[in-house]
Amino acid sequence: MRKFSLAYLTIPGTNPMDQIRIAKECGYDSVSLRTISMHLPGEPEFLLDKDPALFAATRAALKEYDMPLMDIELARIRPDLDVSEYESAFEKAAELGATDVLGSIWTRDRAWYTETAARVADMAKQYGLRYNIEFLPWAGVRNLQEAITLIDALARDNVYIMVDTLHAGRAGVTAEELARTNPKYFNFIH
């Protein structure tokens, strides 16, 4: 049975408590929160690992609305970011029952991003999280084939491709190509 989670970018800038309430009111099965800083000017941050009051309010809202937390985002791999800083976000997500983390890669240095993605995957696994890598045509992993190559290189049982249909279309990925791809690579779509 297909389930639907309210992704953060559907209503960007919305605090976790309101996003959880909106997800419930709209009939979603779960919610996806952005709890990792994007380091973008003017973007609100909802860092559950750094703000105990926000964490408690988010936990209370999940319970009040009986709304599971599916995933957190966005664990980016970029040369100027230290991925070890994601661990506290993964820990708090797991405490709230999350099953997944969404990530993306922003460098073309394949050896470096493969090694770094392995670290993120292993860190996520410590908290029972699946690591879902999104490809974008202007990022480091630009298309479905590059994502498959990375997943195969990582050889970990908690790493998947997250297909954002908007970006897949921009990358020239067809429905036929997706249908021909082994479903073992996929966990969820946007």
Where are these regions (language model features)?
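N-terminal pre-domain/capping segments
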Residues: M1-D100, K125, R156
